[in-house]
Amino acid sequence: MGTFLKVKIIGIAVFLCLFSMACNGKDFHGFQSSVTFSRDESLWVKSKRLTASLGYRFNQKRYLGLGCGVSWQLGYNADLRPNYPVTNGVLNSFPIFVDYVRNFQFKRNRRHGFLLGAEAGVTWFDKPIFPNEDYVLNPHLLLKMGFDVSVANKFGVVFGLNAYHLSSPRGIGFFIGIRY
């Protein structure tokens, strides 16, 4: 990944942080943004993803957001896909998605909770995933579950497991991120 792209991603993350801090009042609702890194593995593809999301938290339990990011798919295991030639190198892709998260707060400490969520969107690849095919748009549905731990006022850390469905590289992985 080029230096210019890294600078753009960091700039977007800082902008989202400042925007959500300026829009949020004292209540636990309003605009919220997050930056998340995930690592996913399927039987035949490994991928890494860095995404940023901006959305609205309706209350302490429900969040709906719109996000985008960048991801990298590594080559796949040809033994599991015998009809396709081996791809080497990295495929760059750019996911755009709608994100919904439902938090279940712990009874003793309402600031921390268990989260369930889903993300539906489309991923655009800079070249076809498989050499024998010509599509570059790949719909995806990502299911996630994990924990949301408040560190300070509205700043928190989220982490957990995710599973891809409805996309070519189906698989499971983990995610970690910050929300503010």
Please give the residue ranges for each predicted region:
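Surface-exposed extracellular loop regions of Gram-negative outer-membrane beta-barrel proteins
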Residues: 145-147
